[in-house]
Amino acid sequence: MSKSSRIRMKSRTRYLIAILLVISLCSKASSHDDEKKKKGVTYDGTSLIINGKRELLFSGSVHYPRSTPHMWPSIIDKARIGGLNTIQTYVFWNVHEPEQGKYDFKGRFDLVKFIKLIHEKGLYVTLRLGPFIQAEWNHGGLPYWLREVPDVYFRTNNEPFKEHTERYVRKILGMMKEEKLFASQGGPIILGQIENEYNAVQLAYKENGEKYIKWAANLVESMNLGIPWVMCKQNDAPGNLINACNGRHCGDTFPGPNRHDKPSLWTENWTTQFRVFGDPPTQRTVEDIAFSVARYFSKNGSHVNYYMYHGGTNFGRTSAHFVTTRYYDDAPLDEFGLEKAPKYGHLKHVHRALRLCKKALFWGQLRAQTLGPDTEVRYYEQPGTKVCAAFLSNNNTRDTNTIKFKGQDYVLPSRSISILPDCKTVVYNTAQIVAQHSWRDFVKSEKTSKGLKFEMFSENIPSLLDGDSLIPGELYYLTKDKTDYAWYTTSVKIDEDDFPDQKGLKTILRVASLGHALIVYVNGEYAGKAHGRHEMKSFEFAKPVNFKTGDNRISILGVLTGLPDSGSYMEHRFAGPRAISIIGLKSGTRDLTENNEWGHLAGLEGEKKEVYTEEGSKKVKWEKDGKRKPLTWYKTYFETPEGVNAVAIRMKAMGKGLIWVNGIGVGRYWMSFLSPLGEPTQTEYHIPRSFMKGEKKKNMLVILEEEPGVKLESIDFVLVNRDTICSNVGEDYPVSVKSWKREGPKIVSRSKDMRLKAVMRCPPEKQMVEVQFASFGDPTGTCGNFTMGKCSASKSKEVVEKECLGRNYCSIVVARETFGDKGCPEIVKTLAVQVKCEKKEGKQDEKKKKEDKDEEEEDDEDDDEEEEEEDKENKDTKDMENKNQDM
């Protein structure tokens, strides 16, 4: 090649390099622009697409006002470790704007801090804005002052209501935007909800209901925040808003989105039933919850939210009428933020199993086969690949069924679904729990409970207030959500010859009330009490009363247990005495309701003076504990309980009232309202450690007791633990889903040892000190209540003690060889174990400590691997759309 040719070649090479460099830079710029365009959340008929990536969303409801900022980090950490990637919360209008135009975002109400903390922990947020939330929360989250806005009607096409709602919505969303908390700004909020379960009331408002719901949808969409919006239980969710399901079994009850390009979202999967005073205990099994989740995802579901994941506490006066202070205690994280096992662990495992199916669920084609009256297979296959995931379902509630799928037999326990992420390997069954179980215990703090000395201050009973009305006033209007109490007084003159002559006849005072409770005094003497219930707020007080000749003064204390939280025309709900009469007079029944002067006084003296605070307590004269009359305040000081365990106060032989610690409202208690089982609905009441001062310091406890004759001596402070842990694993169960991982389209084992194991772990810093029960055979019962069957391996306890005592973590192979057992070959055997954990003084055996640490690190590595695998599997939206178009 000549010199000139070489020069021309070099020149062309340089030119080509320059061109390629320009193309590369343009490509990078374009790629960068594409990434910027991907920021935010969109959706299609398959799922939400977050920052360009599809996600299976496992969400849990955690309400910031129902726990404390001190508790938030632990709760969010446990949610993340439990397999959640999203936290859902309502926004509580009435705590943020208790008075019109005056806002509160401090302490438990610091919404921004809560959302930022969730973001720091790597989770998404779903924000349910209201304005109405229900949530068994006082007034459904609507501020009381809204009732007194002229011409207002809630939740309809009413200008005053819409005006205040829009101002509130713009206030909250403006705060979120200013703090850059929306996903489109790089924040965690991926989804918003406006209104709540509106279909339940829409018919009551006729065409104005439809107009209102369209107005609400337009309001949030017009703000262009870069996230989708949902309406739950709103079949006709307008425009681009997604209609979502609430319920226990949305996989079977939800007809699906109202447009084919909207994803299937489940905003409330109820983990239990909320409780009201007078209720017996209720629960929802984790097997049923897991079944519902697997069923939903097998039918094109891509998002589930557990309502609640942590219920927490209705502190102060925040609960709706008759709702207990403890809220959704049977959730995966209980009232105290402790893991309720096996609910916590078994749901963690279903999340992991479903994540192993993600490729097939997003990019596979659904096929379904009905194999019998109760059995079904639903599976997703991606054409041209080996990607496949199957859900084998047995809906029979009594019988086990065997089915054949792709040439292989599978045994399905009753009412269960098996998940096969590769259409071959069972990694999880909803009815077979390999996760740990636990039992909660309340242990009396002897040091704190000992020697409590109470002082008392009794309320003055107003005998006759200045008459301000000819009829009794409405109780909500009188109290204005500032207090639960309002006095009604009137007088009646009875002539001597109007009393009955016949022996045994007495005059009766009858008070018909719209709710919720009342206490009656006649001439300053206690005459009795009465109350309604959640299902029937109205009730009647009717008792014989010793009226005197001449003027008689009647004092009635109307009592609320919270404001209503649901239904149409909430602004027109009423409570309090509605009809008052005296029966048994010679002259006949005397009606005192109308044309009788009634005086009214909202609140109690102790409330107005804030005797539950240190400063306020100095404004009244406290006396030594003596005769325990109704409407009495009791005060004592107690030392902060030892250790770090959660704390509660046990109100065993008390009646009904309110509790404060260091001036902070713990909540309403009601021990005298017994369930059909003859027990109070709630006995222990949570006192967060952040409400108390440091260890060994004194705290002020104040109790307002409405009823007479209570036993203060029965009050205890208790420490809460879940130090009793159990395992209950059948030898025919699949190995833990944590034993599997995905490599491309394949599901492969994580380790060489793939034997089924019963695994238990004590709380941090504790070790197993006692094996309380062990049986490999046919034991019955549950954690805390196991019973030996007829066939149990003789070495059961010996084997468990050898493997577990002195350790924080232990695993036992569930096999006959482990126990040297050849008996009862005809039965499928179960290993049931119950052990006690304690914090032991002195050093743990170093070998066991190292083994425990290795096991813990292995668990953490499993979680990290799962996240890495998810990252590999995520593809951008364009690729997924191209794939769908090709199909």
Curated annotation (Swiss-Prot):
Residues 838-887 are annotated as: Disordered. It is an enzyme of class 3 (hydrolase). Keywords: Apoplast, Glycoprotein, Glycosidase, Hydrolase, Secreted, Signal. This is Beta-galactosidase 14. Belongs to the glycosyl hydrolase 35 family. Residues 853-871 have a biased composition (Acidic residues). Glycans are attached at residues 269, 300, 395, 785. It is found in: Secreted, Extracellular space, Apoplast. It comes from the Eukaryota. GO terms for biological process: galactose catabolic process; plant-type cell wall modification. Residues 1-31 form the signal peptide. Its EC number is 3.2.1.23. It holds the Pfam family SUEL_Lectin. PROSITE patterns: GLYCOSYL_HYDROL_F35 (PS01182), SUEL_LECTIN (PS50228). The gene is BGAL14. Residues 752-838 form the SUEL-type lectin domain. GO terms for molecular function: beta-galactosidase activity; carbohydrate binding. GO terms for cellular component: apoplast; plant-type cell wall; vacuole.
